[in-house]
Each structure stands twice: as structure tokens, then as C-alpha cells.
Amino acid sequence: MINELTIKGLKCFDEVEFSFENLTLLAGKNSLGKSTVIQALLAMIQEGKNPFRGQYINIGRISELKNKYVGSKEIEITVNHKFVRRMTDDKNEVISEGKLSDEISVRYLSADRIGVRDTYEIALDNPDRIGVRCEYAYQYLAMHDSDKWENNPLVFDQRSKLTFGGQVDYWLER
């Protein structure tokens, strides 16, 4: 579980530390950094030369994302005081200590969704995923439709059908 996140020099942040609980809500006015917190977490699990450009997010070059108001020379993101990623555009360098994606499982669903289609893609490489833009949602639903959900804490009404598909139907009909 992610308990603490420290962000230095990224966008609106000079240096800030967040503590997380089992359920954490990010709320506030526009342009206060809510999206930046999510982007920092995604940058920690995204692979490549620029962790801000890839599968989960594509928000720009490191030089564009540094906090210009305080003259940040680098961006540093730390999770749980254990996993660190430092990025500088001077040498186009990313230095990582530890690999967060080995410790936690992330299912990120972007607010940007694909529209209605006549057909939907199939994930051949990993059929047990939904896709960042929910492009494999129908495949995932079909694969897990009859998965048993007895004694699952996510079940709201025990009188509903206690399968994954039954729970999806229950919430879509509400």
C-alpha cells in the first residue's frame, strides 16, 4: 500500500508530502495539484526514459514539468520513503531507486474513455486487463462474468446475484 508520497519540483509543487490511508480523497479548487498527485504516482510505475510519457500518462517533457516559479533543477518523487525517482533534463536522466511496480498492483482507468464502437479490441498479450481507456472492458467482463463474489466486502446487497457479472448488473440497474 502507498502510505506516503513526497513530490519535489513537479509543476505547482516546490516540496510537499502526502499521507494516505485506506481511502484517500483528493479535493480542492482548480489548479491546486490534485491531478499532479495522481500523475506523480503514475510516473513512479511507468517505464521508459521519460516517466511522464507512456502508457498511463503523456503530459510532456521533464523540462516542461519542472516548477519554474521556484527554479527547480530536478523533479523528485518518493513513495513510502523507499522508492525514489529523480529526473533532470540537463542530461535527460532518470535515476530510480527501487521499482514500485514490483510491490503494488495498479489498475488505472483514465477519465478519457473510448467512444461507442461496432467492435472492441481484444488484449492478446494480457487478457486479464481492462486497459487505461477501458478499451478491453467487454473482454474483462466476459472473462469474469461468473466469478463468485460470496463474502466479498464490495457486495452492497447480499440479495443480489453474488457473481462479478451479477454485481455489475446490480449497479447498472440502480
Specify the residue positions occupied by each region the protein language model found.
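Pre-Walker A-like glycine/lysine-rich segment at the N-terminus of P-loop NTPase domains
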Residues: 1-42
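Phosphate-coordinating catalytic segments in nucleotide- and nucleic-acid-processing enzymes
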Residues: 47-174
